[in-house]
Regions:
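N-terminal secretory/targeting leader peptides
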Residues: 1-27, 43-267
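Signature of the catalytic double-stranded beta-helix
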Residues: 27-43
Length: 267
């Protein structure tokens, strides 16, 4: 994921973990392939001197704000909190007053147990469950804006890729698209199962995250980098049109859910 190139360029986080202007992850992929995002990504690769070819894929649901010792009810609850996240979200959460620590996934639970961190986010109910988040915290905050439209990429060595026959290059590209669809479908099934397990078996309390408007505070500073501003402008213009269509056209799914499963959501 380009989010982990953050130390090389903050622009990298815009390709998969950037701000939400109304678009979801699938619409972010539409920007990549039909809205000019891929051309900007290739420009980034050239600037960084990276000899790779990337196929963006696997749109993700909104990432949870994470695991806490007590529910987060307002921005003031984040002040001074030692919190694990990565990439552009690190700047976002620092703006909210947290003391951010960037750790790989395997170090998160031990760090919480030792008091190195007090709260953390990782990815989704399945990933969080797999490394034992529920064993060290019982408060799970969902519905955050910090990484709300994430997607992945499959990368190949550019020299090796370009040496392949065109039909073999196409096979890899279409395989990435097929894996993208299956990953999304499987994720919808598995994440929902594991969230129910966390609630019912591990006795984790699930909460909605109060929406915190830090993006507007950090973007102006980041946009002093002309290339960062160029990528944000492209994504924002595409989202303005595509998300408008989606939001104007989509039915109210929550209304239907509440009708058939009254009281389940609680908000």
């Amino acid at each position: 994921m380009s989010v982990y190139w953050y130390g090389k360029s903050k622009v990298a986080s815009l390709f998969g973990t950037g701000p939400v202007f109304g678009q979801n992850a699938n619409q972010g992929l539409a920007w990549i392939y039909y809205g000019g995002g891929l051309e900007l990504y290739n420009e980034l690769l050239e600037k960084l001197g990276l000899n790779i070819v990337g196929f963006f894929c696997m749109p993700m649901p909104t990432q949870p704000l994470g695991w806490f010792k007590k529910p987060i009810k307002s921005a003031s609850d984040l002040k001074g909190l030692k919190y694990r996240t990565v990439g552009l979200a690190a700047d976002l959460m620092q703006e909210m007053g947290t003391k951010v620590t960037q750790l790989p996934g395997g170090e998160i639970v031990p760090a919480l147990e030792r008091g190195v961190i007090e709260a953390f986010e990782f990815n989704n109910p399945t990933s969080d469950k797999s490394f034992g988040a529920q064993d060290v915290s019982k408060v799970y905050m969902l519905g955050s804006y910090h990484q709300a439209a994430e997607f992945f990429e499959i990368m190949f060595n550019k020299t090796k890729f370009n040496s392949l026959e065109k039909e073999h290059q196409a096979i890899l590209r279409y395989a990435a698209e097929a894996a993208s669809s299956d990953n999304y479908w499987r994720g919808q099934d598995q994440y929902s199962k594991d969230l129910q397990w966390l609630k019912n078996k591990a006795k984790v309390k699930v909460y909605r995250t109060p929406q915190l408007d830090a993006w507007d505070k950090i973007l102006p500073g980041l946009e002093k980098d002309p290339f960062f501003a160029k990528v944000v402008k492209s994504l924002k213009e595409f989202s303005n049109r595509v998300a408008y269509y989606e939001l104007m056209n989509a039915c109210d799914y929550k209304l239907a859910y509440d009708h058939y499963f009254p009281g389940e959501l609680g908000f």
